[in-house]
Amino acid sequence: GIELFMMLAKNPAGANQNLRTLLLEEEKIHLAVLLNDRTADGKDVSWIWDVDYELVVDRLASLTIGGDRAYDLALRFHYSGFPIASMHVTPSPLGLLEHLKSSIKAGEKAIILPTYTAMLDLRSELNKMGATHSFWEEQ
């Protein structure tokens, strides 16, 4: 299978720090970014325009975009210089996970940058797949 690494990105400061961390990767990066605008995330998603996605655009092997506001995020990546035709956009967390599983070679890893509720949605789907456990369960 593939390895998934989740790094919470809920504001420009955190997202930019995550992106700088990704620059330490030697290989090209399979990146998935999810943006929700639910109450726990904050309704205003204009902060995505303050994130320096341009830092990693040239380092991406693939880009998958999801969440309730996936199309806003796709537009932001378009303006960062990433070609729209090369993005895979799916609002569905399950659809995003299925795409990653089918498009990334076994043994490779994907980095996932979700907002808070998108992380909860992803963990719920991963739990249903048997790939992780619920937060409150002991390992």
Regions found by a protein language model. Give the residues of each.
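ATP-dependent carboxylate-amine ligase
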Residues: 1-139
